[in-house]
């Protein structure tokens, strides 16, 4: 049984007024009495809607600069009153039932994100009456509908039209879930803000102790359930942030192909984040979260051709990311050459999509353009805990590099060094990348000793018939011994870029000088685990 409840009286009080006028007009046209507060009431009245101010309804004025508006028994009694059980007491005290509450809360997150936001500003944007009404209505969802998202307005009107002005219990319950999610997220933001302050009133700190709250409250929204997780015996789902500020796999639209798997999403994220490092047309091919081929060129077609040549074997069944629109010529080259799981790009031309449609299982995602990287937090789950750190958005510029060898790098070596340094940032540690003329020619990933990553990168280049002589080598962290330099010299590397910082730096630099290798220090490490 659906337990329909008619909507005869609604209270509307919103900070985000998108769509509220149209929704109120639709409710009023269906005979719903409108109650409202402050700016919402004035907006509705200005649009010619019959609306009663809550202060007139309760006989009690708004006070304390708007801090007290709706905290009144006529409001909360009307919301919390149980139909058929509390009718007598409601009638005795002149409390009319309120059947729908439409509320969204003061913009606390936007306020504290503003430059120069003071504690006083933040405090004044902590909503009290709003969450109280939301929780009251959600608690009494058997009788009351609570609406916190403007995206639900149209569906609510449609259901009312289908049910003689009523909403079903299933709908009211779903709306109540959204309401509790909304208030939980809101309180989490406030707790995180206050918890990030140093242990003193009004204290503010940019240090780590103040950057991270005492209790970390996180809110993510489920985007999709998955067939399984990393392995078939693991259940999984994909959750995303509510307001993602940067083009990402979380914001991407799937325009073709089967549902994304857990591993597809993880690998696509790795590919997309890597390709974002480049301003020139670039292609990144990823397998098992590691780049197996990266190149930049004058077109994405040539970039793809060159990235593929790094390691065609590993590229099979891989993820391909571009930082330019996917065009028909590039799409045809991919489909004709290899099996691919996912292609992601800022956009895709209609002709490109016609070509990829021939391979219906190929997943094609478009993520939109990105202007800049947005600071945020990275999380790593450990048994019983969570490691939290800033996103690794660091990247050195040419002017920040230090040449520590006797020989200076040539202009081409310097370009190749900066190129493979960007790639090494996204390769699992210990990471070694060989590159020549803006193309990776060998990648050694995830080895327990750095020298073996160097050897593997050389072996891979040799297996594909790529010329290592005169290439640059990037290492995501310092060389603890000279053996990595010796291994690079043995295959013809002529320039090495690395963070430096080892207690044996002098020995490592001496090895570079011995082999005539130019060595560059970045003074920035890029471990990736």
Swiss-Prot record:
Pfam families: AICARFT_IMPCHas (PF01808), MGS (PF02142). Residues 1-148 form the MGS-like domain. One of its GO terms (cellular component) is cytosol. Signal peptide: none annotated. One of its GO terms (molecular function) is phosphoribosylaminoimidazolecarboxamide formyltransferase activity. The IMP cyclohydrolase activity resides in the N-terminal region. NCBIfam families: PRK00881.1, purH. This is Bifunctional purine biosynthesis protein PurH. It comes from Citrobacter koseri (strain ATCC BAA-895 / CDC 4225-83 / SGSC4696).
């Amino acid at each position: 049984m659906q337990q329909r409840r008619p909507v005869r009286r609604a209270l509307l009080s919103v900070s985000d007024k998108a769509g509220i006028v149209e929704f109120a007009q639709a409710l009023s046209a269906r005979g719903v009495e409108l109650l409202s507060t402050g700016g919402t009431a004035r907006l509705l009245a200005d649009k010619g809607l019959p609306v009663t101010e809550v202060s007139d309804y309760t006989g009690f004025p708004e006070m304390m600069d708007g801090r007290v508006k709706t905290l009144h028994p006529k409001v909360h009694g009307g919301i919390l009153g149980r139909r058929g059980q509390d009718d007598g007491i409601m009638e005795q005290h002149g409390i009319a039932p309120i059947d729908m509450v439409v509320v969204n809360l003061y913009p606390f997150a936007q306020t504290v994100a503003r430059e120069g936001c003071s504690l006083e500003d933040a405090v004044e944007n902590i909503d009290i009456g709003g969450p109280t009404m939301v929780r009251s209505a959600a608690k009494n969802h058997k009788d009351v509908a609570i609406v916190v998202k403007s995206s639900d307005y149209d569906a609510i009107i449609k259901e009312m039209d289908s049910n003689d002005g009523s909403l079903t219990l299933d709908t009211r319950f779903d709306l109540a879930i959204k309401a509790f999610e909304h208030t939980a997220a809101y309180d989490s933001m406030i707790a995180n803000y206050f918890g990030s302050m140093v242990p003193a009133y009004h204290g503010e700190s940019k240090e780590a102790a103040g950057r991270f709250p005492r209790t970390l409250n996180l809110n993510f929204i489920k985007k999709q359930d998955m067939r399984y997780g990393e392995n078939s015996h693991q259940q999984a789902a994909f959750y995303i942030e509510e307001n993602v500020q940067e083009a990402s796999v979380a914001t991407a639209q799937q325009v073709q192909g089967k549902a994304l798997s857990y591993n597809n999403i993880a690998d696509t994220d790795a590919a997309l984040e890597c390709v974002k490092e480049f301003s020139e047309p670039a292609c990144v091919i990823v397998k098992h979260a590691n780049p197996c081929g990266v190149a930049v060129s004058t077109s994405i077609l040539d970039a793809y051709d060159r990235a593929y040549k790094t390691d065609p074997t590993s590229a099979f069944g891989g993820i391909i990311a571009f930082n330019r629109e996917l065009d028909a010529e590039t799409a045809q080259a991919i489909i004709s050459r290899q099996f691919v799981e996912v292609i992601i790009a800022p956009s895709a031309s209609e002709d490109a999509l016609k070509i990829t449609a021939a391979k219906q299982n190929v997943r094609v995602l478009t993520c939109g353009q990105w202007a800049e990287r947005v600071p945020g937090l990275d999380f790593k789950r450990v048994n019983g805990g969570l490691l939290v750190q800033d996103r690794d958005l660091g990247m050195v510029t040419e002017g920040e590099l230090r040449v520590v060898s006797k020989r200076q790098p040539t202009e081409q070596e310097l370009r190749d060094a900066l190129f493979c340094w960007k790639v090494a940032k996204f390769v699992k540690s210990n990471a070694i990348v060989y590159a020549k003329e803006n193309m990776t020619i060998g990648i050694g990933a995830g080895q327990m000793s750095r020298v073996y990553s160097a050897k593997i990168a050389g072996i891979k280049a040799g297996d594909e018939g790529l010329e290592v002589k005169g290439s640059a080598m990037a290492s995501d962290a310092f060389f603890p011994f000279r053996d990595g330099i010796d291994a690079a010299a043995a295959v013809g590397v002529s320039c090495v870029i690395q963070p430096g910082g080892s207690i044996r730096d002098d020995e490592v630099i001496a090895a570079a000088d011995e082999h005539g290798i130019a060595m560059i220090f970045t003074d920035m490490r890029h471990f990736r685990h």
